[in-house]
Amino acid sequence: MYVAALTQLFWLNFSAIDTYIEENLHISAFSTGLLALVFPLTYVLLSLPAGMIIDKKGFKYSIGIGAIFTGVFSMIRIIDPHSYPLLLISQIGISLGQPFILNGITKLVVTWFPQKEEATAVGLGSLALFIGMVVSLGVTPSLVDSLGLKSMLLIYGIMGIAGTLLFFLLVRAKPPTPARESKEEEKISLREGLKSILRIRDFVILGFVALIGIGVFNGLATWLEKILNELHGISMVDAGTISSVLVFSGMLGCVIIPLVSDRIRRRKPFLILASSVGAICVVVLMLGSGFAANMVNGIVLGFFLLSALPIMLTMSIEITGERYAGISVAYLQLLGNGAAVAIVPLMEVLHGVRGEHTLPLAFIAVLLVIAIIMAIRIKETAKAA
């Protein structure tokens, strides 16, 4: 969980201080956004190969690869914090490890947890991701203000190396007693795996929901500080507070919603609810004003929208089966991050049309309405206990 949190910490740490980075490194808004955008871009390229490695070698082998990239490149950033090319190369290096870590969560779950606890376990794994986001969005601005950019990168670099060492020292590949009935592992090729999962109607539809949900979240995470500042006059520090509270609320959602889902053996209603509440909250983000109103809106948005991630990952296992746990999650993440590669810069383009963020927010609200329609078409995946 700690290593997974680090990937999100490093993904968003520059987005939390994008105004500072633009002014001190003398670069454009797009160049600053690129420091975060390389993560979904790399995910698109490596997600499926990472998924196949997970299914063939197991979660420890895969996450170990990711932990090495994360630790090493987080330290390289310290060499020259004011060199944009070095920061970009380091971000690319860290992003290379992300698919191997995040796609391994569901494989870890099916290895260590019984089926009746799947959604809860995936929710706890997702919780780690949001802890990383909270620290990145909430703590980074304060660290830079008080200690400077280099000290912030040094602290995060030490955390990265510590994560790598702790993973290899403490994590075991399998539990002493299997959590569920063991099945003979059959090696599958990438092509065979994709053909198998893409024959399943509900999984294809779930892929479109993931495409929109993950893409929209990436867009909001990248530009929220600027949206709050330009639309509502909220300062960088206050915007960071709202962003971190939004993600913290999502952390609670990732624990509570999967617990309820496991208890009542239902997934589909929560997937529909996430997109529905998300669309409403994006409209409120366009029209609402003031710190308090946006804080409350952020709490509601985070709780429901972010809780969709563990629900989607659990549904992917239930639809495709344990055999394809790695590649099915890899495919969903590929679609979602592929959408992010398009949505993040497109939001900036739409912002340029009228010089404000109303148009890009309207765009993602429409996308969430489409996600609602798609989610309704999926059959319930949870089996009665």
Where are these regions (language model features)?
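Extracytoplasmic gate region of multi-pass secondary transporters
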Residues: 14-15, 201-254
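Cytoplasmic helix-loop-helix junction between adjacent transmembrane helices
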Residues: 90-129
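C-terminal transmembrane helical hairpin of 12-TM major facilitator-type secondary transporters
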Residues: 266-315
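Helix-to-loop junctions at the C-terminal end of transmembrane segments
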Residues: 46-58, 254-266, 351-352
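Juxtamembrane intracellular "pre-TM" segments in multi-pass secondary transporters
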Residues: 174-206
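Cytoplasmic membrane-interface "Motif A"-like loop-to-helix N-cap segments
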Residues: 56-66, 262-275
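Conserved MFS/SLC helix-loop-helix module at the cytosolic interface between two early adjacent transmembrane helices
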Residues: 45-83
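A late C-terminal transmembrane helix in Major Facilitator Superfamily
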Residues: 317-356
